[in-house]
Amino acid sequence: NQNGYVFGAIYNKKMEVVHYGTNKKEEIQLFRGSKYVQSKIGHTYQEAKKLLQTGCLVCFSGTPCQIAGLKNYLKKDYANLITVDLVCRGNPSPLLFRKYLEYQQIKYKNKVTGVKFRDKYYGYNYSTMTLDFEDERIQYHYGMEADLMLKFFFKGLCSKPACHQCVFKSIERVSDFTIFDCWNAKFYNKIMDKAGATHVFIHSQKGFDYFEYLKSYFVYQKSNVQKVVEQDGCMMLQSAIPSTRRADFFRDLNNLPFDRLQAKYFPLTLMRKIIIKMKPFFYHIGIFSIYMKLKKML
């Protein structure tokens, strides 16, 4: 409503993750959703600076290192700049993501038109990788036990080396806001539904002022910082832990077809095949939530 610009990570037409700026409300949705890939900053720092110098309001979102990079590039504080970082596990390789998409398109004989790394198809407590294809009849909703991109990421095989000794792992940040998942929303507010909730840390007076201005648009509850970090914020303080096989994995990534990578690093055992089939079945017969509760108990 103030003719401002928002910058953040989106998928371009080539399904690459890139930073992009817009002042169009209908494009804001492009920034939604987790993207477990290192985004290309491109010329967005320069574009943001030009807008700031004209007095335009700018909101720039990204990983902590990207926000620090922006601040370093600008060399000064701007009253009309709002920065938002997120708690990230690490920045996976764009090369891996490109090869993953190529593999899926060959496997399904169809073009991928959309990617959701953390889709809520089965609800907030079990997010999946969802792929959209040109042929809308193709359904792809798989969690870490079946999806290779998620598997490689969460097993520490594909994040860049700097993520393993991240200098931005701290509660205090250079940004105005830090956002991350609130996995234990039910302990804070009973009305939270299966769509989930987000923690918001405010680091500056500017951030506080904007939060006060916007808070009537959403449901919120104040929380204790240390309690939140203990329950949901371990990645705020801990760097990604690399797999001992990471170096081998990247050598193989450049030389082996994607299906050979799966066979070498995560062979499809009979038990994995059973688990992959069980979850969609439980969901369709209406007992998936019961299955997830039993899994947590075990």
How should each PLM-predicted stretch be described?
Residues 43-53, 60, 68-74:
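Cofactor-cradling patches in redox/metallo enzymes
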Residues 1-14, 21:
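Low-complexity, highly charged intrinsically disordered N-terminal segments
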Residues 82-105:
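Short, flexible loop segments at boundaries between secondary-structure elements
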Residues 9, 60-64, 84-87, 180:
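Short His-Asn-centered micro-motif
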Residues 1-5, 110-298:
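Long, compositionally biased charged/polar accessory segments in the mid-to-C-terminal portions
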Residues 13, 60-70, 90-92:
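Gly/Ser/Thr-rich loops at beta-strand to alpha-helix junctions
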Residues 17-46:
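Glycine-rich phosphate-binding "P-loop"
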Residues 4-6, 56-62, 81:
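Generic beta-sheet signal
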